[in-house]
Amino acid sequence: MKERTVSDKPRSIVILTGAGVSAESGVPTFRGPDGLWEGHRVEEVATPEAFRRDPDLVLKFYDARRAALETVEPNAAHAALGRLDAEFGGELLIVTQNVDDLHERGGAKRLRHMHGELKRARCTACGARQQAPQTLIDRPACSSCEATGHLRPDIVWFGEMPFHMEEIDRALERADLFVSIGTSGAVYPAAGFVRIASGHGARTLEMNLDPSEGTFYFDEARHGPAGQLVPAWVEEILS
């Protein structure tokens, strides 16, 4: 196990970001207080069964979410993580649960979308992934196999396996610092990342608007808006 102290500068960082980061840019959080996901029950729009049952509803829902990305901009937290990506000389992996493109637009490159991306599509006929057209409801042809009517959002729906898990697990085992930003601490497997990293000797830090369900697993917690906390923390790391 790695021997670390609080004052040590990290050599390998894994960062997990969730809906709280994008919420400050105006992206709706995953689920409202009424339990609905932008007016829909989750099982209506975010499961493979929903897509088989009513593909038009699902495609319209994601087309609207994709179009909404054009109305939002990266915030100070995205920009700070982009700066960290550019200037941090050690190992870095930013893992996001968010399906928007605000991290990319904020400058992040060492980035993995574990729940997929709104701006990507996947062909259910041949499996090819591609840039999503402006709308999927029109049933465009796959750019790889040219079959029509088989493109779905390249999003991890409930009951499906998150992307990049082997790479994420390896990074968590190597990390000497794990940071969780804007997450609920309730959705697995991401909610278990802190224990994996800690179990391999990493220091752990939570930055969240309010304490998450897993705050007690972290060595340190800072609570407040991500747009304030993250730039200050990045300055500490790079100083």
Region spans (language model):
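Conserved catalytic core of sirtuin-type NAD+-dependent deacylases
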Residues: 1-239
